[in-house]
């Protein structure tokens, strides 16, 4: 199945459901960052979560940033996802590998760490982002984001995230988010039913691997609650907005002396994007042009010389 996101409603609009398949984009991230198995699972889960959270935003420019800072060896995890279906992300220590846990699965909680913080920023594109922070619950990503939604956004939610990776790469990845809308959020029994049903999807990646589609999984979860799956699926993909233009603009921050050293000692500059591992090379000629631009007299009017016009 192609990477995609689908939306649905149930219980007469009282339940919002979103599902996402992220197999190909998670494999692309694995290849770009040369991720270990455990790092692939962690970043894959977080990217799926980012797309699920971004799916409820309204303006086209809306984006969600998820930052996980645990005390595990994987270091920081950072994901940026948009309502437009694009996502990117990285982990600080992508090659870390750990032994399986007691039940033979990737030890995600140990890799991330269960002490630390989860930071989520929602930006609708107007310069007034909303941010929230909670302590990590388990480091498993799904538990931590569910905790955040309940505590910071007061939205009872049930979330399952999964990534299956083997020596051939990422075989399946994705997630499902069920949320109780405010008008029925006080119905604790409904919330418990959703939590129970999502818990039954502990083999979520196995279902995907066996060929189950998101609509079929939704039917199992919510088929007896007046399920209404919206007809249009949204394509999702790994996409970074880095560019050579942005790199050259960032190099201006180093100043004339440091840029001159890059020319003389390194014969240019190399910059790697953290989000996608794309390598950019700035030539001595390009650095020289930046130096010349920096040495040009500023045409801006100093703040002290600004004055109001009289009429």
UniProtKB/Swiss-Prot annotation:
Post-translational modification: Under oxidizing conditions two disulfide bonds are formed involving the reactive cysteines. Under reducing conditions zinc is bound to the reactive cysteines and the protein is inactive.
GO-annotated biological processes: protein refolding
Molecular functions per Gene Ontology: protein folding chaperone; unfolded protein binding
Subcellular compartments: Cytoplasm
GO cellular component, one term: cytoplasm
Alphabetical list of Gene3D superfamilies matching this protein: Hsp33 domain, HSP33 redox switch-like
The family this protein is said to belong to: Belongs to the HSP33 family.
Protein name, UniProt field: 33 kDa chaperonin
Species per Swiss-Prot/TrEMBL record: Trichodesmium erythraeum (strain IMS101)
């Amino acid at each position: 199945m192609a990477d995609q996101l689908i939306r649905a409603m149930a219980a007469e609009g009282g339940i919002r459901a979103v599902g996402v398949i992220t197999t190909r984009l998670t494999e692309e991230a694995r290849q770009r960052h040369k991720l270990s198995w455990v790092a692939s699972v962690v970043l894959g889960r977080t990217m799926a979560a980012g797309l699920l959270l971004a799916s409820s935003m309204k303006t086209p420019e809306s984006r969600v940033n998820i930052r996980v800072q645990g005390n595990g060896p994987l270091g920081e995890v950072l994901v940026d996802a948009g309502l437009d279906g694009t996502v990117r992300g990285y982990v600080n220590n992508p090659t870390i590998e750990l032994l399986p846990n007691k039940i033979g699965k990737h030890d995600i909680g140990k890799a991330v760490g269960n002490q630390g913080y989860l930071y989520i920023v929602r930006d609708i594109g107007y310069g007034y982002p909303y941010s929230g922070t909670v302590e990590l619950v388990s480091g498993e990503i799904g538990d931590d984001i569910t905790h955040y939604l309940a505590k910071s956004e007061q939205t009872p939610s049930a979330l399952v995230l999964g990534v299956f990776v083997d020596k051939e790469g990422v075989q399946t990845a994705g997630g499902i988010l069920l949320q109780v809308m405010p008008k029925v959020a006080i119905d604790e029994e409904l919330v418990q039913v959703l939590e129970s049903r999502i818990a039954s999807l502990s083999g979520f990646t196995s279902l995907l691997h066996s060929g189950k589609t998101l609509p079929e999984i939704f039917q199992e979860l919510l088929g007896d609650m007046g399920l209404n799956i919206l007809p249009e699926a949204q394509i999702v993909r790994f996409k970074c907005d880095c560019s050579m233009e942005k790199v050259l603009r960032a190099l201006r921050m180093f100043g004339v002396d440091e840029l001159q050293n890059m020319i003389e000692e390194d014969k240019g500059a190399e910059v790697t994007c953290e989000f996608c591992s794309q390598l950019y090379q700035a030539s001595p000629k390009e650095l020289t042009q930046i130096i010349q631009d920096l040495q040009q007299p500023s045409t801006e009017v100093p703040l002290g010389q600004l004055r109001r016009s009289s009429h």
